[in-house]
Amino acid sequence: MAYGIVHVFPGGTKEQYDASVAAVHPSDGSLPPGQIFHAAGPSTGGWTILAVHDSQESWESFRDGVLLPQMQQGIDGGFTTPPEETTVDLYTLQQ
């Protein structure tokens, strides 16, 4: 089942987003394994990222193996605080 993640970074900026994505996504511009959708943009009071993975397991693998270690290590110019997170077991996904 597809799995959706919404991250809201209060006070986040485009520059922080660009630095963070450069650190955790493949350098060729593709999506991480298992991620099938990614969108981001400015939102009220910060920056929001929407991602869809092909399963909760692929999200957890990316989160635990790539995202959290990079963020805990610190990303030069990246987001400085953890996001507000909402996750969704997606019933419907149309492309």
Where are these regions (language model features)?
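Short S/T/G/P-rich N-terminal loop/turn motif that feeds into the first structured element of a domain
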Residues: 1-50, 54-69, 77-95
